């Protein structure tokens, strides 16, 4: 899976609920499933996630996005730079643990 197409505009994807304004230049995505669709387009160079996006059964979580990235690595997906901006300590730790797994698999020799 080649997700880095030449000559495509870069996207910085901010995955969070509507109460959080993204930094200037970042695209706000309030739905984990939509975030995954955007990632599949191959234009995302940076992604920053919060855990809670709204009602989980309807919009998923930031962790769902990271688990998708983790699974897509085996198909050749090149992950973007990943950040976590979640403020809830337990949820932040869950996201960071998934990022660590992604880093280990992606950068393993």
What are these regions (language model features)?
Residues 1-109:
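Catalytic phosphate/metal-binding cores of nucleic-acid and nucleotide-processing enzymes, i.e., regions
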């Amino acid at each position: 899976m080649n997700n880095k197409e030449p000559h495509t505009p870069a996207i910085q994807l901010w995955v969070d609920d509507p109460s959080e304004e993204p930094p200037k230049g970042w695209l706000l995505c309030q739905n984990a499933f939509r975030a995954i669709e955007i990632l599949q387009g191959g234009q995302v160079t940076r992604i920053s996630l919060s855990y809670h996006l709204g009602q989980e059964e309807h919009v998923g979580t930031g962790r769902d996005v990271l688990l998708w990235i983790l699974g897509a690595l085996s198909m050749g997906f090149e992950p973007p730079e990943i950040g976590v901006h979640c403020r809830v300590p337990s949820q932040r730790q869950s996201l960071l643990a998934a990022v660590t797994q992604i880093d280990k698999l992606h950068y393993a020799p």
